[in-house]
Amino acid sequence: MAKIHHPIDGKLVLVLALGLWFIGGSSSARVYINEIMALGGGGVVDEAGEEEDWIELYNDGEEGVDVGLMYLSDDDREPCKWRIPAGTRIEGGGYLLIWADGDIGDGVLHANFSLAREGEVVSLYDVDGLRLIDRVVYGRQRVGVTYGRDWFAGGVWRYMLAATPGGRNEGGYLGVVGDVYFSHCRGFYDEGFDLELGVGGGGYVIYTLDGSSPYEVGGGLSVSAKVYTGPIRVDRTMVVRAVGYQVGWLPSSVQTHTYIFPNDVVRQDQAKTIAAGYPDKWSGYPADYEMDPEVTGNPIYAGRLREALLSIPTLSIATDRRNIFDATTGIYTNPLSEGQDLEWERPVSVELFSATQGPHLQIDCGLRIQGGHSRHPYKSPKHSFGLRFRSIYGSPRLEYDLFNGPLRSFDSLQLRAVFNNAWTHWDPGQRQRAQYIRDHWARDTLIEMGNPDGLRGFSVHLYINGLYWGLYMLHERPSARHYAAYNGIDEDEPIDAINGDPTYVISDPLNTGQVSDGTIDAWLDLKSIVAKRDWSRIQQVLDVNNFIDWTILNYFAGNIDLKRGTNWRAAGGGPLRRPWRFYAWDSERILEDPGSRTIGIQDATGLFTDLKAIPEFRMRFADRIHKHMFNDGALSEAKNIARWLARSKEVDLAVIAESARWGDYRRDVHQYQSGPYYLYTRDEFWVAENQRILNEYFPIRNDVVLRWFRDMGLYPAVEAPIFSIDGHYQHGGYVRHGAMLSMANPNGSGQVFY
């Protein structure tokens, strides 16, 4: 047994150079585990076109070998974990690729396990499951890099930039340099410090201060990369990205730490930012980077700005500036551009941290512009983003208890800028209604109505390469995997997800219904079944209670921006026709006129008209209205106000920073359409609208909506009985054994039947 010591992330990697067994009685036939890929990104795809983990076997002999019925395993305790199909052969000097994706349903050469990125064992056993033929213990792997035998160096294991399935491995790196040590962790600072960086094993540190990655695998060093020679003075807001480098070794993973100095943030300056290389225009319209001195220097707010910046979590994005702002390829300067696959997605580092004991994480992922009308730069300078977690960036999921909910693994997240009812909007009426919590409130409400998958989220301050970008919402996105996780089904089961009605197609692609996951087939089936008004089948393919709750919410909140092709989402279907569920999405035009009896589109889904013609559906609808709007239900006045106050408290101080960043945009930077143009501030505008909703909207809205539903024939004029337990109002819940239930008739006449 030979030991090869590779310092990979501080761990010892043991490679077993076994006295390999001769196969099939031939003295010349030997089978090796030749190469593995544990993180994808190498351009090798399976029959479904997906980049999966894989294991390559190599027959070093001259004669063919039958490897059928041999075993592959990633667990020493279970040597017979996956059996190679009978009759599988490797010809002399040939190779066999086996997909280690954990999904045997994808094909005969798909093993029932996947390879761990942090390292594990891979073993090949003979047909008896006892005799070990070959084995490799590997350490932490890198995206797009394989681990294989270098046959020009005696078959030692090395890291290789070029995957060579079906061919002999050549060259490679001796090991991976360990991660860079930072003397100070990301976070908030008031006083400057000397940042020390270090790496063991004889390597040296390369770093950047402009957000770009100092090193790209296969791409070399960044043009702005510097060699660390001594402590770095950090006395202003700064993003430091560093990598360990050593000749002949694969560089370490890039480490990223953002250091925020609140007193520096409030002095964020337009001229200095442009002088640093940022563009003065975004898509032909004036760029704005400044924190407005009229807010930061105002005695009312100056003393509260530091606390405002620390009051909610911070999300820091770091990337090459060109990825965001290049005139041709930047996603922010080309917000209307959409392409296939990853064409308009850019690699970034994301850090999430808090001044308190809140979330703390860093992950590399993809960033893209998100939205419809909000992408138009003349309508809003502040764009929403989507975060995508993929193996090509390092991790296929964000594994973190982000929202204190049941879902702790994410393939995507939403960074919502808030387009409608925001201080940057082109319409003066909407600017005066800015609250930055309406969409949160809608999603919270759907959850409280009994829909735990209703998209959890919280507010964050966003920074891009150290530049404060404003107040954003970070929340779940209703993807296929989101549906699977919340409904307890296998994450690999095909599920469909849609953004608006995909059968609704108009000339504007950004506001046309789209399939975001899967196919349109199950959605077409749902619409067909509903059109036939087959109540029995409808209940199988539609989560009726969820659809009713979603509909009631949109009517109650007066969602005047509900459209056929956008501003709502749904998921379900798939080959097994899972029940479709609906989600509040882009609920920004709500809680405006308390007396309104209109929404954007009465039947945005194309389902409601047929459903409400079914007596059983109307009865269920009335039951859900009563559940939510009476007896301290989720839509009772007290519960509505409680949710609103909770979200208001969350951003109460944070909106001061948003005001300084964007409150002057329409007055001072880009006047569009009509005025009046104000400097929008917390006390004058945000507080006034907040109090209007509390004092004028919620107190009367229930009566307005109940009359509306009654006029639509969806709620009876007769009041429901009032339940009491031992003389106290109680509708549901636990009671003591032997308690006395009484039912009172609130109507002037009639009887109660039960």
Q: Language model features by range: what are they?
A:
Residues S27-Y159:
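Activation on beta-sandwich/Ig-like modules and their edge loops
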Residues G574-R710:
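C-terminal catalytic region of ATP-dependent kinase domains
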Residues A2-L14:
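Bacterial N-terminal signal peptides that target proteins for export
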Residues Y400-A434, L467, M473-A557, R620:
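ATP-dependent phospho-/nucleotidyl transfer catalytic cores
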Residues I317, L387, Q540-S596, F698:
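Active-site acidic catalytic loop and adjacent metal/ATP-binding pocket
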Residues I369-N421:
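Conserved oxyanion/phosphate-binding beta-strand-loop segments in alpha/beta enzyme cores
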Residues A29-Y32, T88-G92, I98, Q141-G339, ...:
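Short, compositionally stereotyped local motifs that mark structural "simplifiers"
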Residues V13-I23:
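Bacterial N-terminal signal peptides
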